[in-house]
Amino acid sequence: MDQLEGEEKTYLSCDTVCKATTLNGETDRLYSTEFLNSLPFPGIPNHELKLKVGLPVMLLRNINQSAGLCNGTRMTIIQLGRRFIEAQIITGTHVGEKVYIPRIIMSPTESELPFILKRRQYPISVCFAMTINKSQGQSLNKVGLYLPKQVFTHGQLYVAFSRVTRRDGLRVMVNDEESKEDDVVKNIVYKEIF
């Protein structure tokens, strides 16, 4: 992010505990705002979200599927407003369209905490790279695949390789120290399960 010109803007979330999971209004004394702000959850942006114009980001929630605002959609930030973020879609069927991202309330789907956190934040994360699973369903002009070890499930190589629209748009880096063979990645199929 430091390589992008322009001013960095920090957005802070508003974190609260869902009233339905509290005990007689004791929530404020049990869980401080600082504690709630410190909690990280997968699929939910952190309390402090640092952004810049030109930064690639990924949408973390379905907002408007017909407009291309789906979980996993990648965008480039155009403007950082007080109440919205303007972005341009760079993947999917709505490439080039400008969209406005509002703050929304998100809660983790799985948590071992004795309460449900409600975090009001922009549903995006900085995205210079993505997992194979997150790329599923997208068509991309260029795909760089980094494989530090063997893929962990059948079909992952197929999903990764089939994202790219042209053969010359694919680059693969295999860096598996444990593998005895050079430049080989196994796509193992267990015929016993069929």
Name each region found by the language model.
Residues 1-194:
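RecA-like helicase/translocase P-loop NTPase motor core
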